[in-house]
Amino acid sequence: MNAPVKPSHLIKGATGEWEMVIGIEVHAQVTSNAKLFSGASTAFGGDPNSHVSLVDAAMPGMLPVINEECVRQAVRTGLGLNARINLRSVFDRKNYFYPDLPQGYQISQYKSPIVGEGEVVVDLADGTSFVVGIERLHLEQDAGKSLHDQHADMSAIDLNRSGVALMEIVSRPDMRSSEQARAYVTKLRTILRYLGTCDGDMEKGNLRADVNVSVRRPGEPFGTRCEIKNVNSIRFIGQAIEYEARRQIGILEDGGGIDQETRLFDPDKGETRAMRSKEEAHDYRYFPDPDLLPLEFSQGLVDALKADLPELPDQKKARFVTDLGLTSYDAAVLVSEHESANFYESVLADLADARRDGKAAANWVINELFGRLNKQGLSIEASPVSASQLAAIIDLIGEGTISGKIAKDLFEIVWSEGGDPRALVEARGMKQVTDVGAIEKVVDDIVAANPDKVAQVRAKPQMIGWFVGQVMKASGGKVNPQAVNDLLKAKLGL
């Protein structure tokens, strides 16, 4: 039975409405010092062919030996995806010819992958969430790289990537919009980074997506899909899907048919172009690799790895909401990047009262800090304001030493000049005025100067905010707004 189609997910064509169906295969480079079947380095940026073993170059007589750390990383990832771990899996040869594939085949897993079905819960910007099913995760070798701009009449081959371990994470076709697809890949990358199993660096090619797109009339069976190969940014994933869906709709509405094919996305033109006809599994002539025994490990290994998993984004988000009273949205923003969550937790650790000021800390991190970082194009690691400095500013507010307005001025000073917030408050005379007599004098002056406003506020008590603002302005923001509010109510008989 087909699930109801959300109107926002439908695309209007010339002859009616269409629905996208999207599935994604993510190729994530395993975080490991050595390759999947050799001891060669996986370091990025070396000279061409400087990280190549005899196994990677497919020299005769060289046999592959499995890297245990890559197996552990795949199991950790499967556990992080709430997936079934297969205690026995098999490596297969995927046969095809390409110049940068020296063996003439890729060692992969076909019928018996290391990880089975799982799922990812994905949050959207509007506060809703949806589930993407994971069909499987398998280990495989990466290929080398063909360089076509080194010589005018020939191509060069760099085998540094050849044999690097990849996890291919295959989703079910559960996405119905480019927004959902972008959100899914973003969430998956976040999980991998929390686990430490892939750094998710798409610019270096450490995370790449093959995006399968088809269109259909709502309620009809799946259409013929096209695969958009090796999309290397979240933004490009969205652009590629939007273009490809429109392209297919145009063909179908003109009476044509969709060819099942592999396509490439051209980010300069914002369009996809045909690469080759899409292969079926039988085209690759899979068979078990005779040089590798089946991969077997115990449930005890799985249990030990599970016990050692870090707190993952969904768990951290739930804790922030339950323990600190954060909104679901704020908690989701904070956990969306591992570094952001770590920064926020460092702020909490330095606060005098984390339970009291946890929500205030979230507001400061999200609105003030993230806003400033985004404006200047800086990462959280490059923040001029440290977690301990931000915690000190929040403590100064919480204990009544400075007002919220002065705190923003103090934040600007720390951002630009650095320094200890407490020392800066003392040195620059930024302390909040707490003397009731001094505050009362300012209030009396404002009330005496505005008799018309006094009459208005007595008729409409909610206008008291105008008086509070005037007092704050007259005092340079150095008085406690709540004290001003209470004093005004007493003076005006509200």
Curated annotation (Swiss-Prot):
* Highest taxon listed in the record's lineage: Bacteria
**EC category:** ligase
Q: Determine if Lyase is one of this entry's keywords.
A: no
**Which GO molecular-function terms appear in the entry?**
asparaginyl-tRNA synthase (glutamine-hydrolyzing) activity; ATP binding; glutaminyl-tRNA synthase (glutamine-hydrolyzing) activity
Instruction: Recite the UniProt keywords alphabetically.
Output: ATP-binding, Ligase, Nucleotide-binding, Protein biosynthesis
Q: Which SUPFAM superfamilies match?
A: GatB/YqeY motif, Glutamine synthetase/guanido kinase
Q: Which reaction does it catalyse?
A: L-glutamyl-tRNA(Gln) + L-glutamine + ATP + H2O = L-glutaminyl-tRNA(Gln) + L-glutamate + ADP + phosphate + H(+); L-aspartyl-tRNA(Asn) + L-glutamine + ATP + H2O = L-asparaginyl-tRNA(Asn) + L-glutamate + ADP + phosphate + 2 H(+)
Quote the EC number.
Answer: 6.3.5.-
Recorded hits in InterPro entries, A to Z, give: Asn/Gln-tRNA_amidoTrfase_suB/E, Asn/Gln-tRNA_Trfase_suB/E_cat, Asn/Gln_amidotransferase, Asn/Gln_tRNA_amidoTrase-B-like, GatB, GatB_C_1, GatB_Yqey_C_2, Gln-tRNA_amidoTrfase_suB_CS
Per the record, the GO terms for biological process are:
glutaminyl-tRNAGln biosynthesis via transamidation; translation
Q: Which SMART domains match?
A: GatB_Yqey
**Pfam families linked:** GatB_N, GatB_Yqey
Name the Gene3D superfamilies for this protein.
1.10.10.410, GatB domain, N-terminal subdomain
The protein's assembly and partners: Heterotrimer of A, B and C subunits.
Q: Which NCBIfam families match?
A: gatB (TIGR00133), PRK05477.1-2 (NF004012), PRK05477.1-4 (NF004014), PRK05477.1-5 (NF004015)
The entry sums up its family as follows: Belongs to the GatB/GatE family. GatB subfamily.
Name this protein carries in UniProt: Aspartyl/glutamyl-tRNA(Asn/Gln) amidotransferase subunit B
